[in-house]
């Protein structure tokens, strides 16, 4: 496969065209008066959304060099989404601004390495300033404000606030599709731990890459399962009941794992294996918690139990189990209420008695998992298209709210980024490093500028007025007013704003220091090649 290489200015300009195409499609969605983007789907109705990362993921460009540029900015959106769960459009706008301004300076002869140093210095100072501005989220009302701003819907903010109030800030909140028109909040008891399936072939929903088990049996053991023969007698009993099984063990490997996957693919039975949560003695305690919650007998050498002798009666059960790549959630375990209450009392006593902050924290986590619930926001809408769009907005709002609880909030609407301008501009530097700092300074204005332009205003006028306003005072594009953003409830999670800036700067610096780009040459179509072979004319 032949490949083509482009160098320096030619390479960067080709990639810039891709950056601009993706960023221009994404940035029309930013702000309260941002527009939607319609995405063509291979199956089903088109998706209408204003979610930056969803739009970015759909963009594939024909030119390989332009596509590489688009993929770089796509990475900014993906990374920001992974870390903060929101702010992907802001990150895209910042990345485009830094790349465009940086490229002008590289073309004028600036050293990309010097620019990178300046960008890094400026971002470090900006993040420091953001943390200084940050305020803690202290009540239910503030949580609702964060959710409402992210989703551009006060009702969604209220649902998220109520859900977090019922299951705690660290509780499990899942988002499901409702069969009706209305969105509802439902709280069900459940336990979640950070271990996922041991093989992707165990999933029951290949689109979401998760395994949903209805009324499963649950095997709880601290043993390592290597031989399929050890669990075969138990699985034979389960096959007759036609119910799925969740296997929680120290590890399922070798012959056992292979046969579980093969039988799952053949449709013989549905089994999902996950590693036991925790480590050392804490692992054993957490397995005991799961056994009590589900009504299982904990199969361990300490109690003299052997896997080969296990029966269905020793298994726990639950109403539902959801397993993803990273997490397992057990909903409505069928454990004895008195046993669960006794375990809760025991944990509370241990929390009071321990002198270790670390142990206390871990005990509180276990208590929360044993007593806490799973809040389910059931999303309703009049059409499938609206349902998908609304679900995406709620997911973003939930992520944004969690981020706010973790690191606090700053003034929204891009105001916080402009508020760090003064502190960043005071960094002492010279030459290309100073130019790198100026690249970031100009980029800090970009989100506010774009929000204003999406509202039909001249962005530069709003930016200049904001630079001279008191810190915290910003432009409310929804009402066309200048207000105290925090008092008005127009806030952004510090984590979202910080992540967007850091990820945008990282990709911009990589872009500017790129000197060569390698891409495959398009294959020539030789179907209409030579003449037909003698004596075979007319044959296909």
Curated annotation (Swiss-Prot):
The reaction(s) annotated as catalysed by this protein in its Swiss-Prot or TrEMBL entry are: ATP + H2O + a folded polypeptide = ADP + phosphate + an unfolded polypeptide
GO BP of this protein: protein refolding
InterPro entries for the chain: Cpn60/GroEL, Cpn60/GroEL/TCP-1, GroEL-like_apical_dom_sf, GROEL-like_equatorial_sf, TCP-1-like_intermed_sf
- What EC numbers are recorded for this enzyme? 5.6.1.7
Q: Which GO terms describe its molecular function?
A: ATP binding; ATP-dependent protein folding chaperone; isomerase activity; unfolded protein binding
Keywords associated with the record:
ATP-binding, Chaperone, Cytoplasm, Isomerase, Nucleotide-binding
Chief location: cytoplasm
Top EC class, one word: isomerase
Residue positions binding ATP: 29-32, 86-90, 413, 476-478, 492
GO CC terms, sorted: cytoplasm
* Location of the protein in the cell: Cytoplasm
* Any Pfam family hit: Cpn60_TCP1
Which regions span the lipid bilayer? Answer: none
Q: Which residues form the signal peptide?
A: none
Q: How does it assemble?
A: Forms a cylinder of 14 subunits composed of two heptameric rings stacked back-to-back. Interacts with the co-chaperonin GroES.
Family stated for the protein in its record: Belongs to the chaperonin (HSP60) family.
Per its database record, what is this protein's job? Together with its co-chaperonin GroES, plays an essential role in assisting protein folding. The GroEL-GroES system forms a nano-cage that allows encapsulation of the non-native substrate proteins and provides a physical environment optimized to promote and accelerate protein folding.
Q: What is this protein called in UniProt?
A: Chaperonin GroEL
């Amino acid at each position: 496969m032949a490949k083509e290489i482009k160098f320096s200015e030619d390479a960067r300009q080709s990639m810039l065209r891709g950056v601009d195409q993706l960023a221009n499609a994404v940035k029309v969605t930013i702000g309260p008066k941002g527009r939607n983007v319609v995405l063509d789907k291979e199956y089903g109705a088109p998706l209408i959304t204003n979610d930056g990362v969803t739009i970015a993921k759909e963009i594939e460009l024909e030119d390989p060099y332009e596509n590489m540029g688009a993929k770089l900015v796509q990475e900014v959106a993906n990374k920001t989404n992974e870390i903060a769960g929101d702010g992907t459009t802001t990150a895209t706008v910042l990345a485009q601004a830094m790349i465009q301004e940086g490229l002008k300076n590289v073309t004028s002869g600036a050293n990309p390495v010097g620019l990178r140093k300046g960008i890094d210095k400026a971002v470090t100072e900006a993040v420091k300033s953001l943390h200084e501005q940050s305020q803690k989220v202290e009540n239910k009302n503030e949580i609702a404000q964060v959710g409402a701003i992210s989703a551009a819907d006060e009702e969604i903010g209220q649902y998220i606030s109520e859900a977090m109030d019922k299951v705690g800030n660290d509780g499990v909140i899942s988002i499901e599709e409702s069969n009706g028109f209305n969105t509802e909040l439902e709280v069900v008891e459940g336990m979640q731990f950070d271990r996922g399936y041991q093989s992707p072939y165990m999933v029951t929903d290949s689109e979401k890459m998760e395994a949903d088990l209805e009324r499963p049996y649950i095997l709880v053991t601290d043993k390592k399962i290597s031989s399929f023969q050890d669990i075969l007698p138990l699985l034979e009993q389960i096959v007759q009941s036609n119910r799925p099984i969740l296997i929680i063990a120290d590890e399922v490997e070798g012959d056992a794992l292979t046969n579980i996957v093969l039988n799952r693919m053949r449709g013989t039975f549905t089994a999902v294996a996950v590693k036991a949560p925790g480590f050392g003695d804490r692992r054993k305690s957490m397995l005991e918690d799961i056994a009590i919650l589900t009504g299982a007998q904990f199969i361990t050498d300490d109690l003299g139990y052997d896997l080969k002798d296990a029966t269905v009666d020793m298994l726990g059960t639950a109403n539902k189990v959801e397993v993803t790549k990273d997490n397992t959630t057990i909903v409505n375990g069928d454990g004895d209420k008195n046993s669960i209450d006794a375990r809760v009392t025991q944990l509370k006593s241990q929390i009071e008695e321990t002198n270790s902050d670390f142990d206390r924290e871990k005990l509180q986590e276990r208590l929360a998992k044993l007593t806490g619930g799973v809040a389910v926001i059931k999303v309703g809408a009049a059409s499938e298209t609206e349902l998908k769009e609304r679900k995406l907005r709620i997911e973003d709002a939930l992520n944004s709210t969690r981020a706010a609880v973790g690191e606090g909030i700053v003034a929204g609407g891009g105001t916080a980024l402009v508020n760090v301008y003064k502190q960043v501009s005071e960094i002492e530097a010279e030459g290309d490093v100073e130019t790198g700092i100026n690249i970031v300074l100009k980029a800090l204005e970009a989100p506010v500028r774009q929000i204003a332009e999406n509202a039909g205003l001249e962005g530069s006028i709003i930016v200049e007025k904001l630079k001279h306003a008191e810190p915290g005072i910003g432009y409310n594009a929804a009402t066309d007013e200048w207000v105290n953003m925090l008092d008005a409830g127009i806030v952004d999670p510090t984590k979202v704003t910080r992540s967007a800036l850091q990820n945008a700067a990282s990709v911009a610096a990589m872009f500017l220091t790129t000197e060569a780009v390698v891409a495959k040459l398009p294959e020539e179509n030789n179907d209409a090649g030579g003449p037909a072979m003698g004596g075979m004319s007319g044959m296909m």
